[in-house]
Amino acid sequence: MRLSEHIYRTISSIRGPLLFVERVFNARAGEIVRIVHPDGETVDGEVLKIEGETVLIQVFGETRGLGMDAPVAFTDGVKMAPLSPDMIGRVFDGSFHPIDGSPLFVPERWTPATGQPINPTARARPEEFIETGITAIDALNTLVKGQKLPVFSCAGLPSREVAAAVLQNARLAGGGEFVVVFVALGLTHHDYSFYMESLAEMKTGFVAFVNRADEPVVERLLAPRFGLAAAEFLAFNRGMDVLVLITDMTNYCDALREVSTAREELPGRRGYPGYMYSDLASLYERAGRIKGMAGSVTMLPVVTMPEDDITHPIPDLTGYITEGQIVLSRELHQKGVFPPVDVLPSLSRLMQRGIGAGHTRSDHRAIADRLYRHYAKGRDLRRLEAIVGREGMTAGDRVMLDFADAFERELIHQGSARRDINGSLDRGVELLKRFSLEAA
């Protein structure tokens, strides 16, 4: 450990958010540096790579206006997150600076933004139900504490509105201390205004990290890490159950690709860096529960699939790491269904651990199975209807077609209304009874 900062004025190249500094001694990967602009403003950076006496630095801010003789101070520290329960109800930018008009709270502790991985042997099984207020999730693809469940969307679909609905309506069905950590990446000014209004209407505790599209790209890589550091502190140091909602991971991965290109790294699939899988895992795997400790971190990241392609590297790699997916449908959106969740390709792999007696209702599994089965049959019969026409189908087939329509119109569609789990299941039972399918 050095006793003082080492200051260099040997910048050899500036490429976007990257600096190359020569004749540097005793630097280490991950070390935080401070760069001074000509106007006296300072900006932080991080050592990414060391080759001999040349150091590559990723700058957490603007590099325009920097000269080759700008002072670069190596601090011997790493990027730290200031943490305290007082951050609840606050809004920060991607560098953990307050943007809500209030000063920074007095930190109770500082922790590395990268966090500490949970020992696999210390992980507790994800279980217990988290109510989102959305029937397609709560009744049919249940979210449980400690799970990581992504939302797969497409360009033009209302993923923003779905995220806001979860943000405002999520809570623990059985009560308890519950906080939402909201991380928004690469927002347009319109989206920024929308989410700030949504945060102003929050009735539960929240901590928000908001990065706009016109802010430094590197902040899009920092914001999720700060958000997860905050979530881990509240969960494992304060015993709270925390839901981390990140939108949009596609913007995060695009930022990762942009920085990788500036570093002149060899590209992988679709130009994304080959380490994108491990980078995403370093975020997603911070969700979970720890044996013998109260609190949990549950993650709900939103992924916009480029070109509606679920095999694109971003949703593809996300699917390998996470425990299911909630899929938004363009067809349902065109029918006016909100939220447009297509329950057939959607899946919550841990649903069984969070439903049933003691969690939701003893008949939850049976109701969900019947709804799935009959809706899947009705959807399949729509293809036959397109060929032979409705008149050429049996009376039983026409009942299934009507059920599929009613399922989308009355069960999946709920507009801006919030439904609790009992209301969602009761609505499903009523639908089955109306079509005489409750025992089928």
UniProtKB/Swiss-Prot annotation:
Record-stated family: Belongs to the ATPase alpha/beta chains family.
Organism field: Geotalea uraniireducens (strain Rf4)
GO cellular component assignments: proton-transporting ATP synthase complex
Pfam families, per the entry: ATP-synt_ab (PF00006), ATP-synt_ab_N (PF02874), ATP-synt_VA_C (PF22919)
GO biological process: proton motive force-driven plasma membrane ATP synthesis
GO molecular function, a single term: ATP binding
Function according to Swiss-Prot or TrEMBL: Produces ATP from ADP in the presence of a proton gradient across the membrane. The V-type beta chain is a regulatory subunit.
UniProt keyword terms in alphabetical order: ATP synthesis, Hydrogen ion transport, Ion transport, Transport
Highest rank taxon of the organism: Bacteria
Name of the protein described by the UniProt record: V-type ATP synthase beta chain
Gene3D superfamilies (alphabetical): 3.40.50.12240
